[in-house]
Amino acid sequence: MFSDRFEQLVQALRILPSVGPKSAQRMALHLLMKNREGAFGLAHALHEASSHIHECKICHSLTENEICDICLSNDRDQHLLCVVESPADVMAIEQSGSFRGKYHVLGGHLSPLDGIGPEEIGIPYLIQRLSSGEIEEVILATNATVEGQATAHYLLEATKHLPVHMTRIAQGVPQGGELEYVDSHTLSQAVHNRMKMK
């Protein structure tokens, strides 16, 4: 319609979740017509973040360093590990102020129909991490979706041979809901009222 560069911008914006062609077009027009300075700021911030933020070598959350501050902290409970699907879940739990242990980010959930098995979300690495003997309790805080529940169940079965106490965050997180959209109070209650699984 306008130019190849405009279409490239629209297509680039469509990689964002829940952004369809119309939304991407509206965003592109807004950036170019009403907020060109904001567009340059956005491009710079995106470049900086993409260049300097990567996965923590231990927990797989996001960090600017090789190892994130949470993994490096001696003030956190070294024996308590919370397993989540994404860095957004770490942010949500941290904002609730209800957890003082360490994290492990799977980077997704099991979905055999989509070709996502245990290897694709790093479950062997998690089991290796649990085998070190330092972790005493694991809180499974995968989403309350069918896939999240299946992932939690798989982890429970895969760790039966380990001397680790497995718990699941209490329901209170809506069925079918994702942690990053749950309010802090509900999430805090869910962490405090976690259930024994093993």
From Swiss-Prot:
Domain Toprim: 79-174
Keywords noted in UniProt: DNA damage, DNA recombination, DNA repair, Metal-binding, Zinc, Zinc-finger
Protein name: Recombination protein RecR
SMART domains registered for this protein in UniProt: TOPRIM (SM00493)
Renumbered zinc finger spans (C4-type): 56-71
Keyword Chaperone attributed: no
NCBIfam families: recR (TIGR00615)
GO biological process, one term: DNA repair
A molecular-function term among this protein's GO annotations: DNA binding
Domain of life where this protein originates: Bacteria
Name of the encoding gene: recR
Its job: May play a role in DNA repair. It seems to be involved in an RecBC-independent recombinational process of DNA repair. It may act with RecF and RecO.
Record bears the keyword Kinase: no
Gene3D superfamilies on file: 3.40.1360.10, 6.10.250.240, RecR Domain 1
Signal peptide bounds: none
Family that this chain belongs to: Belongs to the RecR family.
InterPro entries: DNA_Rcmb_RecR, Rcmb_RecR, Rcmb_RecR_Znf, TOPRIM_dom, TOPRIM_RecR
